[in-house]
Amino acid sequence: MDYLAHLVVQPLIQVDRRVFTILDPNLNRGLPPFLTEKEDVGLMIAQYTISSLLNRISLLVYPSTIFTTPTSASQEDHVSNSYNAALKSLEIMDLAMDIAAIEYLVSSYALLKRPWFDKTSSMVKRFVKELEPVFNKMFEEKTLGELFASSKKILDRLSDELLKSLEKKKDLL
């Protein structure tokens, strides 16, 4: 379980860098600052949130197996750590899905602002269009936390659909 936790961290750092690039007008090749036309914070909070979640993950990735407690007449030592390692890994995976949902929201919104969006693949268009109800409420009364949660639900549903589709194709092979 400790290895799983470590495996997830580097891709999440890359997600943070991608979101940072999308929101920074000096790096995003023509998108508005923080993806808003207004003098507003826009989606700046999205990157703060990812950074905060990554900080939490950095605390959780410290290996549970560093400390061993011999058990069973010294026959077992790492078994006593597996419960905590599993709990930490579950929390990390949940936080990773939160980060993925935020990236999904930010990157999809950025894609919609690109003039060439209509030339993207049908799959990309479908994933972006799934978020249209969320985008319509983006800068209104909803909090970004509610929008991130909506994005996560949509991402969960789409990933389930994708897995089912892949399982069907696997059976055909």
Regions found by a protein language model. Give the residues of each.
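C-terminal auxiliary extensions adjacent to catalytic cores
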Residues: 1-173
